[in-house]
Regions:
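Conserved ABC ATPase "signature" region
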Residues: 103, 113-129
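Conserved ABC transporter NBD signature motif
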Residues: 59-79, 214
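The feature captures the beta-strand-to-loop junction immediately N-terminal to the Walker
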Residues: 39-41
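Catalytic Walker B motif of ABC-type/P-loop ATPase nucleotide-binding domains
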Residues: 157-161
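Helix-to-loop junction immediately C-terminal to a conserved catalytic motif
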Residues: 54
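A short, flexible loop at the N-terminus of ABC-type nucleotide-binding domains that lies
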Residues: 1-25
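Conserved H-loop
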Residues: 184-190
Length: 236
C-alpha cells in the first residue's frame, strides 16, 4: 500500500507541433510503493507522456510538478537519479555490452554496481551479458534495460510497453518483478496488453484523447471492464 505521494503533475500539456497537443490538461498522482498501469488506444499519448517525464520533449507546459514533496523539473539531476525509464524502443549505447552499460548507468546514478545474478537468470540472459547491444535481438535488448531497471531499484520506474519482444517465460518473470516492486518503490507502466495491466496493477489509468478519463482500482480492475471503456473510446 502506498504511504504518501511520490509524484504529482497538474494540467500537463505536451506537443510535437504547438497547434496539435498530444496531452491536454493531463493530471497524475502517484503514491509511494504502488504499481500503476497506463492503458489507452494507439495515439492516446502514452509514449509522449513518458518522453516528457524523461526530459526528452521540449514542447510542454504544466501548472505544477511535485516530486517527493518538492517542486521540480523533469531535467533536475535529483529527479533523474531517482527514476529509470525503459522505452518501448531504445537503440542507444549500441557499442556497449550489457556489463559495460550496467557499469555506466550505476556510475551515472552514483550507486555501486548491483548484483544482477538472479535477474540475468530469471530473464534467461546468461549467454548475452558480453554481447554488444547492437547485436542483440529486440527481446534481448529489452531484457538489457529491464534487468538494469530492476537492479537499480529507483523510487520510480517508468516502463513503456515492457512486454513487447519478450518470450513467455520472461514475460511471467517480468510480471513477478513488477508486482513485487512495491517493496522498493513505484512502477508506472504503459501497455496495450490487458493481461499485464490486470495481473500487476493496484490502479489502472485509462488515457483518452490526451488526458486520464477513467481510473480503476481494486476489484474494478478486470479485463472486461477496461475493454468496455476502450471500446467506447474507439467508437467516439
Amino acid at each position: 500500500m502506498n504511504s504518501g505521494e511520490l509524484l504529482s503533475l497538474k494540467n500537463l500539456c505536451a506537443w510535437y507541433t504547438p497547434d496539435k497537443p498530444v496531452l491536454s490538461d493531463f493530471s497524475l498522482d502517484l503514491g509511494t510503493n504502488e504499481v500503476v498501469g497506463l492503458i489507452g488506444l494507439n495515439g492516446a499519448g502514452k509514449t509522449t507522456f513518458i518522453k516528457t517525464v524523461a526530459g526528452l520533449l521540449n514542447g510542454f507546459r504544466l501548472d505544477s510538478a511535485v516530486w517527493d514533496g518538492h517542486a521540480f523539473s523533469f531535467r533536475d539531476k535529483g529527479f533523474k537519479k531517482n527514476r529509470y525509464i525503459v522505452f518501448a524502443e531504445d537503440r542507444s549505447f549500441q557499442y556497449f555490452t550489457f556489463q559495460e552499460y550496467l557499469a555506466y548507468v550505476a556510475a551515472s546514478y552514483g550507486v555501486p554496481q548491483p548484483d544482477v545474478t538472479e535477474l540475468v537468470k530469471g530473464f534467461h540472459f546468461e549467454d548475452y551479458t558480453h554481447v554488444l547491444l547492437k547485436e542483440l535481438s529486440t527481446g534481448n535488448l529489452k531484457k538489457t534495460y529491464l534487468i538494469t531497471a530492476f537492479a537499480l531499484r529507483p523510487k520510480l520506474l517508468l516502463l513503456d510497453e515492457p512486454v513487447n519482444g519478450l518470450d513467455f517465460q520472461s514475460t511471467e518473470f517480468l510480471y513477478q518483478l513488477i508486482s513485487g516492486y512495491k517493496e522498493y518503490g513505484t512502477v508506472l507502466f504503459s501497455s496495450h496488453i490487458l493481461e499485464s495491466i490486470c495481473l500487476t496493477s493496484d490502479r489502472v489509468l485509462v488515457l483518452e484523447q490526451g488526458k486520464i478519463s477513467r481510473i480503476f482500482t481494486g476489484k474494478e480492475i478486470a479485463a472486461g471492464n477496461i475493454r468496455e471503456v476502450l471500446a467506447s473510446e474507439e467508437d467516439h
